[in-house]
C-alpha cells in the first residue's frame, strides 16, 4: 500500500491483503535502519489468523520517501498521523529496538490509539557505540558486518535456517545497506 503523508510517499506492507482498519489491527514498528522487511514472517503469521496487519516504512527507510525523522517524539507523532490517515482507531503495537521506544512515546502522548504493546529487543536508552559510528564513517560495509555479528552472534554464521536458501546474515546486511 502506498499513501502520501506530510508530502512524502509512504510504503506500508499489508501482507498482500486488503487492509480494513475496523478489524483488530496489529501495527509493527521497525527500528533504526530497518523497514517492513524485518517483520515479514510475523506479519504473515498474524495476517493469516484474522488480524489486520500493517507495517509502514518510516520516512527515509525501506520503500518510503522523505527525510528520516530525527527524534523519537517526531517518530511517535508520525505514527499517530499514519494511524489517523488510515482511520485506525486503535492498534496493538509491536516494536523492535528503537520501535519499542517509539511505541512508548506513542502510548504516552496518544493513549487512545494504543490497545496493547509488545517490545522486542528494546531498552529505555539505546546509545550508538562510538566505535560503530567511526567504523560506519570509514567503512560502511564493515560497520554493517559488525552489526550483523553482534545481532546474530556466532551461530548466525552457520546459515542454519528453517527456510532453505535463507540467511539471516545476508538478509540483514542487505536491509541495512539499503537504508544506509
Task: Outline where the language-model segments fall.
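Flexible "cap/lid" loop of the alpha/beta hydrolase fold
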Residues: 101-146
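Active-site loop/oxyanion-hole signature of alpha/beta-hydrolase fold enzymes
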Residues: 3-15, 40-48, 52-98
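Conserved alpha/beta-hydrolase catalytic His-Asp/Glu region
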Residues: 127, 134-180
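Active-site acidic short loop of glycosyltransferases
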Residues: 22, 87-90, 111-112
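Active-site glycine-rich loops that stabilize anionic/oxyanionic intermediates
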Residues: 31-34, 97
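Short beta-strand element of the alpha/beta-hydrolase
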Residues: 22-31
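Alpha/beta-hydrolase active-site loop signature
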Residues: 33, 58-62, 124
Amino acid at each position: 500500500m502506498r499513501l502520501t503523508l506530510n508530502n512524502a510517499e509512504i510504503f506500508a506492507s499489508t501482507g498482500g491483503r486488503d487492509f480494513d482498519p475496523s478489524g483488530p489491527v496489529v501495527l509493527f514498528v521497525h527500528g533504526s535502519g530497518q523497514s517492513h522487511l524485518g517483520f515479514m514472517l510475523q506479519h504473515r503469521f498474524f495476517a493469516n489468523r484474522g488480524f489486520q496487519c500493517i507495517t509502514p516504512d518510516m520516512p527515509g527507510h525501506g520503500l518510503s520517501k522523505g527525510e528520516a525523522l530525527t527524534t523519537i517524539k517526531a517518530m511517535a507523532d508520525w505514527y499517530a498521523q499514519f494511524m489517523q490517515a488510515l482511520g485506525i482507531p486503535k492498534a496493538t503495537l509491536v516494536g523492535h529496538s528503537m520501535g519499542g521506544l517509539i511505541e512508548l512515546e506513542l502510548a504516552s502522548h496518544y493513549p487512545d490509539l494504543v490497545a496493547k504493546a509488545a517490545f522486542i529487543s528494546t531498552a529505555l536508552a539505546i546509545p550508538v557505540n562510538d566505535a560503530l559510528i567511526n567504523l560506519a564513517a570509514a567503512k560502511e560495509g564493515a560497520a554493517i558486518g559488525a552489526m550483523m555479528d553482534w545481532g546474530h552472534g556466532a551461530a548466525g554464521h552457520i546459515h542454519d535456517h528453517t527456510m532453505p536458501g535463507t540467511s539471516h546474515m545476508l538478509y540483514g546486511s542487505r536491509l541495512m545497506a539499503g537504508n544506509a
